[in-house]
Amino acid sequence: VENSGGAGEFRGGMGLRRVLTPVDHECVFNGAGERFRYQPWGLFGGEAGASGQFQIEDADGIRRLDDKPNEVEVKLGTRITVETPGAGGYGKPAERNAEAVKRDQESGKYSPEFIKENYPTTNFGEQ
């Protein structure tokens, strides 16, 4: 998940996104995870990672589910998205190697806006 790892000298790992769609029958979804309500903290000056989330997309649109959804009926044509939390960063973001920040942007881990806000000593976020 882009921008989900906390900024730091050593950035936090990115969260993952999984989309679940029933194929030939309805089902019931239950979810559980940690750091869906509160962000994973950073250490020694590192920034927090992004919280995880559950979403449901159906005829009524897209809406966020509780952090531990229970007994959610999933009809055909409905999508459940699970985004796991990103990890918090370690150390001050200003200490991150500029080439590492550039690689993070090129690989799609961080958007230019995220880099501009969290790594202002680099100019890679201004492209």
Label the predicted regions:
Residues A94-Q127:
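Intrinsic disorder at enzyme termini
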Residues K68-N70:
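A structural connector/turn signal
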Residues R64-D66, A87-R96:
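Short, Lys/Arg- and Gly-enriched loop/turn segments at beta-strand edges
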Residues V1-E57:
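Long, charge-dense accessory insertions within large macromolecular proteins
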Residues I56-L65:
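Short, structured beta-strand/loop micro-motifs enriched in basic residues and often containing a Trp
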